[in-house]
Curated annotation (Swiss-Prot):
It comes from the Eukaryota. InterPro entries: AN1-like_Znf, AN1-type_zinc_finger, Ubiquitin-like_dom, Ubiquitin-like_domsf, Ubiquitin_dom, Znf_AN1. GO terms for molecular function: zinc ion binding. Residues 28-103 form the Ubiquitin-like domain. CDD domains: Ubl_ZFAND4. This is AN1-type zinc finger protein 4.
Amino acid sequence: MDNRKEPPFFNDDNMGPFYYRLHFCDTMELFIETLTGTCFELRVSPFETVISVKAKIRRLEGIPICRQHLIWNNMELENDYCLNDYNISEGCTLKLVLAMRGGPINTRRVPTDDPLRKMAEYLDSSRVEVWEKTSCSKQVTFLVYQEGDQLNFFPAVDRGDGTLTPLSDSSKKIDFHLHVLRRKGEHRMSGGSMYNSDTDEDEETEPSSSGQQIIENSITMNKMKLLKAKMKNMNLSKKPKKAVKIKPHPPVAPRPSSGSTAPSRHRLLRVLPNIGQSCSPAFGNAYPPEISRNGISSLATQLSAERYISSITGEFLKEDNSWENNTLSHFSSNVKLPPQIPHLELGNDQELADSVLHLGSSLPRQTKHFLGNLPSSNGNIVLPSEECVTEQSLLPKVGSLASFAEGNADEQSSGLEGACKVNLELLLTNADKGLKAPEQHLKHVAGVLNGESVETSVLNYRELSPHKNRLLSPLRCSAPMSLHNSLVKPERQSKCFEFGKLQPSSSQSLDVQNITDSSFSRTTCFQGVKVDSLGKRSDVISKVEARDITEMTNKASKEPVGCVNNISFLASLAGSTSRNRLQSTRGAGRLQNSGTGLSTNLQHFQEENFRKSSPQLEHTGVFLSTHGVGMNGNNAAAGKSVGECTTHHLPPVKAPLQTKKKTTNHCFLCGKKTGLASSYECRCGNNFCASHRYAETHGCTYDYKSAGRRYLHEANPVVNAPKLPKI
């Protein structure tokens, strides 16, 4: 304790460490030089770590520690070592190098064995030996620096002690170029050395993984486009095909022999149903539909649905020459084509004969028998208008064809007991052609019947009553027939085409019954005779019009039949009047199905009056034409009853005795059925439903403005006050 200047300690043994600690407190001056040449002085301790020195530089200059790199004797100082470890004494100069802001973009360690061999394609052939000089046990690090769109790669070897050295000891540049495809365009990666040496050298560009992915995406997109195109073609091919267009053709089966009655029954036309109904067999056919269709559609079952049925008119006429001569001779002498019908569809007289229904001939009455005993020289030929070849054929909505009833073989000499089947119309399924094709076909019934006075073409009610699903179709004719081109010769007798029952004892009654249909009972709302037209839907005859027709018929019975202008067929007259009433309706519910039966509005013709006139009657042929109304849409009469000039009369018709039927109201705009609470009558005079009852919804034609002015004028009359005398 001699030296009083020293502080006292507990013992003398601590003097050694005491001097050591005093030596630790010594400081020294260091000079820090930057790359720009700026130099500043820093006082540090020799036992201070490098990171503490960097912290002092950060406090002095504001440079972040992560960006500071101190280099002394070409060696970077580690953060964990002291200055004394590097033998840095007082007065030494340390170089301060600033790192890139944010650090390297990507640092990836690549083993030098196999991956570097695979990456040799990215290197020049002269630089492959650079990788061979390196040890396989060491790792190679790529320092990536970004300058705009250019990436600089600096390969270096990790020595394992935390230091990175260039891959080549010499100043040889180890740069290589990678071609990278980016989203915004192509950007080139240029290589450089650790010493910022940039030179232009040969490049080898290869598409990277992103480029390959883009190529694969384009290939996949092309495949998807091809697949979508194929799917679109498949969807187009799955669309329903158009209706198969079938031309009218004669029946396939040969005509029945003279002594057979059963084949004549089954050689009948199939009833063409409406859309939504099943094909029902012909009237009077006791066999299944397969047997009933055997005579008519034997050829149709052998042909495909997509092919047109070829006409076999020639073969059929060659097979039966007698029928051909008979039909052609009587057709040419009795029935002539109206001038409105073009001769384009009928190529020759054979097709003309096949297209016309020939119900009778001009043979003597003693040899005329219908369906009972048919002579070989006289064939009662019924030509089908069309056959249901496939279910895919879309038939237009037409009335069902009237069919033959059974004949009675016991009364061959006296006439017929059954009914004669009538081909009512010739159909075409190509309705999409604007109904131009039906204009070129004959649709008339040649009601030329010769024989006894009791021979009348009828439709027996007893044959029709068991078949609830078969309906009578109204007669059709393509053009109005005149008196001279539609009837037989004046010396021939003509028959009247009627509906009813035929009494064999020369007493006839015209009994028109109501044939109900199970399918039509659900949809038909009106009762009346409906007349089908080719261009429009069926129309309905009201009760008042039916009474008018009956009165006109009674008046016509007292006059000669030869007055053509005074007689109008009941269906054609009603069709022209009721068409104007129903033409403005828009709903489908207002218009009923085309094929429907005769209603009870024309029931119970007076049997006694008909019996009185039946022995002397020689009835006339009746023709109906809907061509004028269906095609032209005019308001003229649909057809005329054309009769031969004779002195005989039509039977008187009694007005139908029927109770009132409940009428239903429909909306004038949409056709919706309206009840008692949902019927609204507008001031324009029409009935509307709840949604269309307002004037702005149905376009009311009532002038509300003028009516309002009138009401205001009546409620508020103009009052002229008397002038007050001046005072």
